[in-house]
Curated annotation (Swiss-Prot):
InterPro entries: AAA+_ATPase, AAA_GajA/Old/RecF-like, P-loop_NTPase, Retron_ATPase. PANTHER family: ATP BINDING PROTEIN, DNA REPLICATION AND REPAIR PROTEIN RECF. CDD domains: ABC_ATPase (cd00267). It holds the Pfam family AAA_15. GO terms for biological process: defense response to virus; DNA synthesis involved in DNA repair; double-strand break repair. Keywords: Antiviral defense, ATP-binding, Nucleotide-binding. This is Retron Ec83 probable ATPase. Probable ATPase component of antiviral defense system retron Ec83, composed of a non-coding RNA (ncRNA), a reverse transcriptase (RT), this protein and a putative HNH endonuclease. Expression of retron Ec83 confers protection against bacteriophage T2, T4 and T6. At multiplicity of infection (MOI) of 0.02 cultures slow growth when infected with T4 but do not collapse, at MOI 2 cultures enter growth stasis. GO terms for molecular function: ATP binding; ATP hydrolysis activity. A motif (ATP-binding) lies at residues 92-99. Coiled coil: none annotated. Gene3D superfamilies: P-loop containing nucleotide triphosphate hydrolases.
Length: 542
């Protein structure tokens, strides 16, 4: 059907032909409906749908925003996730609604997952008991973003007789799922996005049973991309399935070429080149010079060539195995040489050159191992043709990300997640200042009394006690503690000019003995006393 098309449509066609997904998608919509002032043309609509499917590669899937109405404790909440960085942190007291927001997003993701991986349009709904008390309807509205296009959805439920108050609508994600399926029919190796949720139950102990029972999983496993969505939103990393999968990969790996081992060692050495402290300092001093830019460009190009060469050597299974290993080693410093033990059946890893069963690791180490292994396994299945499957896109929700982690690990968890999984959007909850002070304030939401608030400026890089007091609204010292009260009493004596009294001297000595003379507050009070004595002496001399 020939049409005289408006200039805005011809401009879209030019952009579409140059590879712009957003333009192709808009044209698919334009020719498929009368809403846009152009005569519908089914053939043209199908053409641009297929073209947009071919242009999917390289995009990032994101939750752009969410709107809750009468869902659990929230009357109305709109939360924007279109931040600069990939991670968003939700903080607040117990019961403030952090997990409720993750649950709401998870419900939406079940609908998206089914549209990507199956022919059904199943997904979780809002249960009657999840309606806010006294209300007759509830809804969860989510906007997903893919390559600049918004794909909306609404999950709603109503009491009988109030059906007009809210209605579910899945048209946006139906279209997104349809485009991905079209892309898969054109190219079965096209990358799909990861969708996963990890609740506090992910920390359930990795046990001997997980290893022993892995044999219950039948031999005939087809590890295709759609298996990556299996149980991805149930909340727990499936270590039993991971062990079975890892065991099969190792059995295949045993027949691999020695060239792969040498090439991988060369790549690791190349990647470590820029970590040299002296070289880092030199590059930082001359970061804008042409020589520095050329050096970095040459380094990246040579690394790319090596990785492409490695990719050509690899079987899919061998590449997958090393991808998962590398991900785990990046999170567990000092760990290496993950291997299978046949009798008794076990998974062994070297920790600081000492071989240990994974069952002997600390709870925090096992929690990280299971989490990272699960994410990496799913990404490798979803990105079968990628040089680095860990660069795949997706959305991952993690409740209480600090669970079982030492404070130093809490401090590193978000930066390492972002470094290892560069294109994943992480939405996490935490009670830890150590997690928060590695993230810009604009990426943190504070929840309180059913409302959201932006974090105060300066969280990133701040000392933990400042974050504790200014973000979490927790006093730096326990207010009801005996020594906190004594310290406040001593402070009052100093600032009321009674620092020379017997009570003040005794109190100062007691506190110095308890906290040590280098306590920050005691040092400040000592300087304050010296200043006041100097001022008194100065006045006497006048």
């Amino acid at each position: 059907m020939e049409q005289n098309l408006p200039s805005r449509i011809t401009k879209l066609i030019k952009k579409s032909e140059s590879g712009d997904f957003a333009s192709s998608y808009q044209l698919y919509k334009v020719f498929g409906s009368k809403e846009y002032g152009v005569e519908p043309d089914e053939k043209m609509s199908d053409y641009f749908k297929e073209l947009s499917a071919k242009q999917l590669e390289g995009g990032q899937l994101r939750v752009a925003d969410i709107h809750l109405e009468n869902y659990k404790g929230f009357e109305s909440l709109i939360m924007d996730f279109s931040m600069k960085k990939n991670s968003t942190i939700l903080v607040g007291n117990n019961g403030c609604g952090k997990s409720t927001i993750l649950d709401a997003i998870q419900k939406g993701l079940t609908h998206l997952s089914s549209r990507l991986s199956t022919r059904s349009h199943n997904g979780d709904g809002i249960e009657k008991h999840e309606l806010r008390k006294g209300q007759n309807y509830a809804s969860i509205a989510i906007n997903y973003d893919y390559m600049g296009i918004r794909f909306p959805m609404i999950i709603a439920t109503t009491e009988p007789g109030y059906e007009d108050r809210a209605k579910s609508n899945y048209s946006g994600i139906n279209e997104l799922g349809s485009i991905f399926k079209t892309a898969h029919s054109i190219n079965p190796n096209v990358s799909f996005p990861l969708i996963a949720m990890y609740t506090v139950e992910r920390a359930n102990d990795v046990s001997t049973r997980d290893i022993e029972n892995s044999e219950e999983i039948k031999e005939a496993q087809i590890w295709d991309k759609f298996k990556a969505y299996n149980k991805s939103l149930t909340g727990k990393a499936d270590f039993k399935l991971f062990f079975r999968w890892f065991k099969e990969l190792i059995e295949i790996e045993n027949s691999d070429n020695a060239d792969i081992t040498a090439l991988r060692a060369e790549i690791r050495a190349k990647e470590k080149d820029l970590d040299n402290p002296l070289l880092k300092a030199l590059l930082a001093e001359n970061k804008n010079s042409e020589t520095t830019k050329k050096l970095l460009e040459d380094h990246q190009n040579s690394l790319k060539v090596l990785k492409e060469k490695l990719n050509s050597y690899y079987s899919v299974n061998s590449k997958t195995l090393h991808t998962v290993e590398d991900a785990m080693y990046s999170f567990l410093p000092g760990f290496s040489n993950l291997k299978l033990q046949r009798a008794p059946l076990d998974l062994i890893v070297d920790k600081n050159n000492v071989s240990l069963s994974v069952l002997q690791l600390s709870q925090g180490e096992k929690t990280i191992l299971a989490l990272i292994a699960d994410i990496a396994r799913r990404l490798t299945l979803l990105n079968p043709n990628s040089v680095n499957p860990l660069d795949g896109t997706g959305i991952v929700l993690i409740d209480e990300i600090d669970l079982h982690l030492h404070p130093s690990w809490q401090q590193n968890i978000i930066p390492r997640l972002e470094k290892t999984f560069k294109n994943i959007q992480f939405i996490v909850t935490t009670h830890s200042p150590q997690v928060c002070h590695t993230i810009d304030s604009q990426n943190i939401w504070l929840l309180k009394n059913g409302q959201k608030f932006k974090a105060p400026k300066g969280v990133r890089g701040a000392i933990s006690s400042w974050v504790l007091e200014n973000l979490f609204e927790v006093a730096q010292r326990p207010p009801e503690d005996k020594y906190t009260k004594l310290l406040q009493e001593y402070k009052n004596l100093v600032f009321s000019e009674k620092y020379a009294s017997e009570d003040a001297r005794k109190l100062g000595a007691t506190l110095s003995q308890h906290f040590g003379p280098d306590d920050e507050t005691l040092v400040e009070l000592k300087l304050e006393i010296e200043k006041r004595i100097w001022e008194d002496d100065f006045e006497k001399d006048q």
